[in-house]
């Protein structure tokens, strides 16, 4: 108790001790708020693969025509549609290639289909497509369909002998790409997005797709008879099953 009283009786000493303590606290506070300066580091850019590197990672597949199948499903329409037939038009001698890259966006697809090689209303193909394609038309009806289809009023096969399908952009996973394709058909080009399913099995590549096109988009007026009582529907369903074999030689 006496020591405390003695200390209180010496204000100069107390003032100096309080001032020193306050200064020390301020220094500590300043030291806590200012962190040591860290050397700055610039963000590192991700390496961009060169075209040569992409080419080395690209695998080329040649379309195998004997194993591939492209079908155009053509439907009847109009008030008396039941008097007509639905048709299965199969492409033959399909040509082209697929280049598959580790970077899907660098992949590509090209298909060429000779129009004159179309096979119309094959019995097996119609059976595959189900009840909508029963019954099987007779040979005379099939021949008439072929004449109309290849003629100037529809496909005009003499003037436009091939259909070309080329990829413009590919997006999505390797097993299910959305492929933007440019279709050149009947002298007209149109772009559509085609969802695909892709399966790799050893040295083979299988690409399947189902999509629709409108004849009128390609400058074709769908056929009709009896003042439109029996018509060919404008929309054509396209079913593709493309099988391609790996080509061992590196792409040029």
Regions flagged by a language model, labelled:
Residues 4-5, 22, 223:
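N-terminal hydrophobic alpha-helix used for membrane targeting or insertion
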Residues 19-30:
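Bacterial N-terminal signal peptides
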Residues 1-15:
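N-terminal secretory signal peptides that target proteins for export/translocation
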Residues 13, 17-19, 47:
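Detector for intrinsically disordered, low-structure N-terminal pre-sequences
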Residues 11-13, 23, 248:
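N-terminal processing/targeting junctions
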Residues 32-252:
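Low-complexity, acidic/polar, glycine-enriched regions of mature
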């Amino acid at each position: 108790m006496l020591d405390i009283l003695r200390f209180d009786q010496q204000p100069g000493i107390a003032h100096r001790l309080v001032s020193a303590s306050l200064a020390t606290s301020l220094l500590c506070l300043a030291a806590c708020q200012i962190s040591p300066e860290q050397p700055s580091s610039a963000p590192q850019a991700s390496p961009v693969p060169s075209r040569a590197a992409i080419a080395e990672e690209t695998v080329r597949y040649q379309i195998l025509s004997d194993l591939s199948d492209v079908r155009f499903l053509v439907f009847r329409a109009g008030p008396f549609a039941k008097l007509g037939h639905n048709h299965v038009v199969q492409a033959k001698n399909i040509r082209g290639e697929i280049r598959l890259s580790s970077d899907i966006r660098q992949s590509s697809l090209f298909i060429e289909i000779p129009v004159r090689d179309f096979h119309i209303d094959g019995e097996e193909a119609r059976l595959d497509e189900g009840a909508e394609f029963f019954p099987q038309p007779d040979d005379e009806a099939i021949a008439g369909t072929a004449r109309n289809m290849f003629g100037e009023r529809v496909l005009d096969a003499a003037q436009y002998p091939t259909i070309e399908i080329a990829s413009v952009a590919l997006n999505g996973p390797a097993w299910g790409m959305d492929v933007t394709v440019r279709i050149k058909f009947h002298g007209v080009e149109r772009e559509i997005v085609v969802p695909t399913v892709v399966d790799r099995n050893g040295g083979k590549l299988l690409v399947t797709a189902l999509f629709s096109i409108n004849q009128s988009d390609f400058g074709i007026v769908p056929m009709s008879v009896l003042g439109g009582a029996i018509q060919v529907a404008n929309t054509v369903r396209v079913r593709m099953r493309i099988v391609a074999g790996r080509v061992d030689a590196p792409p040029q």
